[in-house]
Amino acid sequence: MTITLEQFISQLDESGVISAVDIAAFQESQSPPAESAEDLGKLLVKQKKVTKLQAQLVYQGKGNRLLLGNYLILDKIGAGGMGDVYLAEHRRMERRVALKTL
């Protein structure tokens, strides 16, 4: 499934990963600006504005999976027989934690 640049920006904003305003400022600082969702995702990951996992999930239309309560999923740390472990950040306190999902 290919999504447009506008859809990608909208989903990044809706998922809480990065605001549309911040993306617009980022795009203005790029020469030339990204013209596709894939290119923008690569640039954002390269500049550490989003993680590779975040860009992939949003690109796949699964950005809603990045929010778990007050936590924003940043990256996958590991997986095992009982579930997955993610690096996450509390959205208000900005504290990083390991979250295990079963």
Where are the model-predicted features located?
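Proline- and acidic/polar-enriched loop/turn elements at helix boundaries
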Residues: 24-25, 56-57, 89
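Juxta-kinase regulatory segment immediately upstream of eukaryotic protein kinase catalytic domains
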Residues: 53-62
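Conserved ATP-binding/catalytic core of the eukaryotic-like protein kinase fold
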Residues: 4, 12, 45, 61-102
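N-terminal anchoring/assembly modules that precede and organize ATP-driven motor systems
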Residues: 1-50
